[in-house]
Amino acid sequence: MNINSANPPLVMVHGWGGSHQETWQKSGVEQLLTESGRTVIGVDLLGHGTAAKPHDPAAYSDISEPIRTAIGARSSTVDAVGFSLGAIALLHAATVNPNYFRRLMLVGIGNGVLDEHDPSETQRIVGGIEGTSATHDVLARQFGNYAKKTSNDPSALKAVLLRPRSKPFEPKDLKTISARVSVVIGDRDFVLPADRLIESFENCELTILKNCDHFATPENFGFIDQLLEFFGAE
């Protein structure tokens, strides 16, 4: 079934240390969407994939700029899905323009996006990249290994982490987002809980994936099923 006539383009945004190719193309998710008739707009965030990779943290202060550029000056809404950092960037874009999106799927984020940034958590991950984290700090080491994948620039990814942070998202701003929102999180994801985030949206549903951690989420079959259903691509 070709559904382009009924549905807008679908913007897809990867997470920290990923890229459109690594996150959405290699897994076959983009192919499933295009075979159903969806038009995909793939975005590589600054510091990732085919985008420029500056090493100055200040270059990453506007995290959603690549998304807003990809959307352009459209007169109609688009759909979007983002994982982890990509979900945060999409949420930032939606607060810049609450009418950007028709349907918005946020994957792998929780209540933490409503709280003040904790620099010590960033330093944990930076330690993982630099190889200075404690041997028992599994999460930091996972992030470090992720940063050192062949196609990545660890210095650029460290700069992303050290970027100037905006104030936390506020529920009153999230209430203005006109999109139907779906939040998807694995039951073993460190970003849980997500109750305050869910309650901040006017129209939001939550899906918890069984036996799934943060890094496994984009390739989880339950996630892919939910994505196809939410965006009408079944």
What are these regions (language model features)?
Residues 88-132:
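Flexible "cap/lid" loop of the alpha/beta hydrolase fold
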Residues 145-170:
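Hydrophobic, aromatic-rich cap/lid helix
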Residues 189-196:
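Conserved alpha/beta-hydrolase "acid-adjacent" motif
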Residues 17-30:
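The serine-hydrolase catalytic nucleophile loop
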Residues 212-224:
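Catalytic histidine-centered segment of alpha/beta-hydrolase-like enzymes
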Residues 33-52:
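Conserved alpha/beta-hydrolase
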Residues 61-78:
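Conserved acidic catalytic loop of the alpha/beta-hydrolase fold
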Residues 177, 183-185:
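Short beta-strand/loop motif that positions the catalytic acidic residue
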